[in-house]
């Protein structure tokens, strides 16, 4: 039996995105702190809203302190759906782990990045309950 299946669908393909939304109990849309990412997330938010699919946004690759991140968070919350409180930072541990075919949870389980991933997972699980 499978408890979770993650589908990584491109935001630019309306058909793929619609199929992924239909199959999901919850859609997580990662957004980097950039206006382009926010604008690219609008079609996904519109599809989710039109079909009444649950949607949450996760800020990803965030710098430690940047006003732009807060502005993008505000913009994401205005698109509809839920804005997850945890943020995943831009961490070297993620890239280094990927080079080994692993995750930061495996290579650096006590790192800030691993803690951020655990916090995001906990927030997602809470939405699914």
Each language-model region and where it sits:
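Switch II (G3) loop of P-loop NTPases
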Residues: 1-17, 31
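C-terminal boundary of histidine-terminating zinc-finger modules
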Residues: 98-116
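Structural beta-sheet core signal
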Residues: 7, 29, 57-59
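Conserved Switch II/interswitch segment of TRAFAC-class P-loop GTPases
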Residues: 10, 21-42, 63-65
């Amino acid at each position: 039996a499978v408890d979770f299946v993650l589908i990584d669908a491109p935001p630019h393909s309306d058909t793929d995105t619609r199929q992924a939304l239909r199959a999901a109990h919850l859609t997580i849309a990662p957004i980097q702190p950039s206006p382009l990412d926010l604008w690219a997330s609008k079609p996904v938010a519109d599809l989710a809203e039109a079909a009444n699919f649950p949607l949450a946004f996760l800020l990803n690759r965030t710098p430690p302190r940047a006003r732009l991140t807060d502005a993008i968070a505000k913009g994401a919350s205005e698109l509809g759906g839920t804005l997850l409180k945890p943020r995943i930072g831009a961490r070297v541990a993620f890239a280094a782990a990927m080079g080994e075919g692993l995750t930061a949870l495996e290579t650096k389980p006590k790192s800030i990045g691993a803690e951020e991933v655990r916090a995001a997972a906990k927030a997602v699980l809470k939405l699914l309950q």
